[in-house]
Curated annotation (Swiss-Prot):
Catalyzes the conversion of glucosamine-6-phosphate to glucosamine-1-phosphate. Pfam families: PGM_PMM_I, PGM_PMM_II, PGM_PMM_III, PGM_PMM_IV. It comes from the Bacteria. It comes from Coxiella burnetii (strain CbuG_Q212). This is Phosphoglucosamine mutase. Belongs to the phosphohexose mutase family. GO terms for biological process: carbohydrate metabolic process; peptidoglycan biosynthetic process; UDP-N-acetylglucosamine biosynthetic process. The keyword Transcription does not apply. Binds 1 Mg(2+) ion per subunit. Keywords: Isomerase, Magnesium, Metal-binding, Phosphoprotein. It is an enzyme of class 5 (isomerase). Its EC number is 5.4.2.10.
Amino acid sequence: MQKKYFGTDGIRGKVGNSLINAEFMLKLGWAVGRVLANSHSATVLIGKDTRISGYMIESALQAGLSAAGVNIKLTGPMPTPAIAYLTHSVRADAGIVISASHNHYPDNGVKFFNKDGFKLSDELELAIEKQIDKPMKTVVADRLGKAARMNEAHGRYIEFCKSTFPSNLTLKGLKIVVDCANGAAYAVAPSIFHELGAEVVAIADDPDGFNINQTCGATDTAHLQEMVVKHNADVGIAFDGDGDRLIMVDHHGLRVDGDELLCIMAIDRFYLKENAPLGVVGTIMSNLGLEQTLKRHHIAFERSPVGDRYVLDLMQQKGWFLGGESSGHIVDLGFTTTGDGVITALQILRIMQQAEKPLADLKKVMVKHPQVLINVPIKGILDIAQNPNIKKAITEAEKQLNGAGRILLRPSGTEPVIRVMVEGSDEGIVRQTAEMLAAAVQQSTL
C-alpha cells in the first residue's frame, strides 16, 4: 500500500508548509500514541536537533501523545543514534527524533524508532497513517500521559559510546578537530573524545537555532579541512545536524568519505578475525573502488537503494553486520542499530591507534574511481525515465563513457532535487558528462 505521509526516512518538509506544522504534529503524536497504547500504558522518548522549530514540534507531539494516554520522556538536543540506543536501554515503547538531518534550518521532520532501536516497519508506519486520518479524541483525565525531562540522557549516551572503545586504549597523543555542524552532537561529541584522552578543538559547536549545517558539518567540510591544517591536527571529524553520519579529514586536510571509512573498517575486521564480515552492504551510489577493494580481500559486496533503512534491510536479509553510504551513514550492528557518527569515528580512531598509522595511510587501501555528484533543484515531480531531453542526454553520456563507467539519475528522498552521479576512469570525461546531464535535467524543469 502506498504511504500518504511517511517518506524514506520518516516525515520531512518545510516548516509551516506541508506536514511540518503544529496542527499536523499534534495529530501525529496522537496517532502514534493510539497505535502504541492499544494494549498497555506506553512510554515514548523524544529527542531533537537544534533547529528553532524543534520547540514547536516537540510541544505538539508531546500534547498529542499525552492526549492518547502515552507518557513522554524528553531528552532535549541529542543525536539520532542516541535516541535509538536510549529507547532500547530504558525499555521505552518507541523513540522519536525531531530533525531534518543534513538540511538547513527551514526544514524539519520526524523519524521514529521501535522499542529495539530500529526504524519502524512499513506496516507500523501504515498503521500510524490510518490513525492520522481518524477524528482525534482525548482520553479521560486520569489516563492522560505525563511528561518528564530525562536529565541523565547525555551522560548515559556518552558512557555507552566510550564503552565501544577498547578499555586498554586511549586517544592520548591525538589532536582532533571536531565539527559538530551546530547540531545535535554539540553537547556530547567533544566530551567523548576528550574523556578518552584526545586534545579536542571543537568548531561549529554553538547552535543558535538557525545555523545548523550552515557552511559546516558533513556536507560542507571546507572549514574543517582548513582548521585541521591550521591546528596541525591528526584528524578532523564532521557530523551532520543529527549526528548519524560522519565524514573525516586526514592530517593533510583531505576528505575521507563514507566509502573509504567503510572499507577501512571492513578490512580491519577481516584481518582481526573479530566479527569478520561475511559481506558488506553499500548502495547504488557507492564508489566502484569500494566494491573492487573488498572483493580483492574476499569480502562480498552488495548494493541497496540509497537510504540507511535500505542498507540495514539488506544487511539483515544477508545476516551481515556492516554497511553504509558514501555520505557517511555507516551501520555497525556489532554496536548500534542505526548509523552513528560518534561510534564510527571511534572505530576509525581505534584502528589508527592500533595500527600506529595516520588516516592518510589507512585510506590508501582503497583506490577511488573518479565520481561526480551534482544535485539539480526541481519544482514538483520530474519523470526522469520518460523525459525525452533527459533520455537523449543519457544516450549521449553513455557514448562519452564508452562502456567504462556508471550513470545514475535519481530523485532525492529527502530534498526537492535530482541527484546526477557519473563514475568512470577519466576524471575530465566524468565531470564533463555529469555537467551535461545536469544541464539536461535543469532544462527539463523550466
